[in-house]
Amino acid sequence: MTNEKWKIAFYGEEDFAARMKGNVTPWLYQNVVSGTTLSLDGIRLQYYYALNPERGKTITFIHGFGEFFGKYHEVMHLFYQAGYSVFFLELRGFGRSQRLVSDPELIHVNSFNEYIDDVFAFQYQIVQPLTRGDVHILFGHSMGGCISTLFLERFPKFFDKAILSSPMLELDFRTSDWKLQALSMISTAPNLNAKPSPSFRPFNPKPDFAHSSCASEPRYMYQFSQRLASDKYHTSGSSYGWTRAAYAAMQEAIAYAGDIRIPLLILQAEHDHLVLPGGQQQVAQRARNAAIMKIPGSKHEIFNALTEARELYWQVIFTFLETPVSEIPAAG
């Protein structure tokens, strides 16, 4: 189905694979540029972008835990169709960016400040020079939503609007070995910092759609097939250091949300088994100009929901980008 107002084509469950092959894959080869840059501490970062010939609007994507560029092919193509230049950064330790540990399945940082530095370097060195004068939008999903919140608090003038999709602002430890996670958060033994946390699970080469964060099976299989093809996409569990860093980052993101000055849209999944809504509500209440909406029928990855929920999600996003945040209806 094509939305004439925003010039974008929505792909259903039945035609997703064919549309990706026929429309998105050629776009990736013809329009997307890839490259590397260095973060502030010299870590090598992989990035991707496509400059829209219409120019004037740019969106930067900050991905979630264990994610990589290939998971966002459809999302980036949708924004490109709507007239946006699109930029994607693979944070340190993810995808083809440099890792801090040798295990390709382990996710480790000492502090989320490292991710903030990655985003700053990407914006300053790559995005801004290519898009001067554009309206700049920040899009953060899950872990990327937490990183985006912190970035907006520290650098309130980099972006004009921001979208947080299922932002990781309060984790649901009840469904993820919470006692062991709590142990990893309070442990400060230096020799454990870069070691797998007690909740670490190695990459499983067998697909498990039923327990995934996707409601759309063809979208799940699209990204999972990429995971199987390269061990660079096998990141699957956190270190002790990452877990402690995430806990501190979520607390800071909520505490300083009042420093966010730009219009902010927070989108919640109705059936989110990874993050709790409380932290999202607190950020929405404290930020100066925020709207929050729950998308019925969606799981954690709302952009991978079934057709009805997914189209509502996009309708809310593009409406937000075109209108003042005060005009977007709130939902419970």
Predicted segment positions?
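Catalytic active-site module of serine/aspartate enzymes centered on a nucleophile-bearing elbow/loop
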Residues: 296-332
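Short alpha-helix in the alpha/beta-hydrolase fold that links the catalytic acid
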Residues: 262, 276-285
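Short beta-strand/loop motif that positions the catalytic acidic residue
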Residues: 260, 266-268, 272
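Alpha/beta-hydrolase active-site loop
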Residues: 107-127
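Alpha/beta-hydrolase-fold enzymes
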Residues: 147-234
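Active-site glycine-rich loops that stabilize anionic/oxyanionic intermediates
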Residues: 64-67
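Conserved alpha/beta-hydrolase
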Residues: 69, 76-102
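An N-terminal hydrophobic leader/cap segment in hydrolases
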Residues: 1-38, 44-48
